[in-house]
Amino acid sequence: DKNVLPFRVDYIKTMDTDKEIDDEMVWDINREKAMMAPQRISLVTKYMLEHFDQKTYRGGKTYVFNSLTNIAEVASDKKDAVEEVKQKQRISGFNAIFAVASVPMAKLYYEEFKKQMAADPRRKLRVATIFSYGANEEEADGILDEENSEDTSALDQNSRDFLEAAIKDYNEIFKTNYDTSSDKFQNYYKDVSLRMKN
């Protein structure tokens, strides 16, 4: 019925093979090191910035959407006492989520996005980061523990400082006042979620 966005996977060729080199079987590679290589992170970020409009249908067809206009108030509401105020708006394109495997990787990508966007003002996106503080490891039954998005007290100091700086960037973009304290962090988490839907 054309009411669902298509799911599309792009495969990008990342390397050529030399026919004159004998291929040798190995047990495995250091995947984490390969995925977190600065050159890889730089190239992936560059690709996303260059193709963001195309992949999210920016500048293409428009549609009418009931946008939430009081996001900060709704995010700060503890008892669902604030009524959502929505307004019909014509919108072009969709928002995007970029998920990575670890907090250190999230930090590297966040910094790389900031660096590349500062170097090329034509490629400005509103980038936020959020991550859980727990060890998102599988339990013996194969099920992941629930993350507790309401508390940052278990974050190591480096991660908390990083998240505090990222939230400060977010506050500057959206004129909000969040931080990593328990109540304000929960509201930041909700605010990011609401803006993604909007």
Predicted region positions:
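Surface-exposed beta-strand edges and their flanking turn/coil or helix-capping segments
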Residues: 19-24, 142-145
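A short acidic, often aromatic-flanked loop/helix-cap motif at beta-alpha or helix-coil junctions
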Residues: 14-18, 135-138
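Alpha-helix boundary/interfacial micro-motifs
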Residues: 18-20, 118-119
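Conserved C-terminal RecA-like helicase domain
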Residues: 33, 39-43, 47, 51-198
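Surface-exposed beta-strand-to-loop junctions
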Residues: 22-29, 88-90
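Post-DEXD/H (motif II) to motif III coupling segment of the RecA-like Helicase ATP-binding lobe
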Residues: 1-17
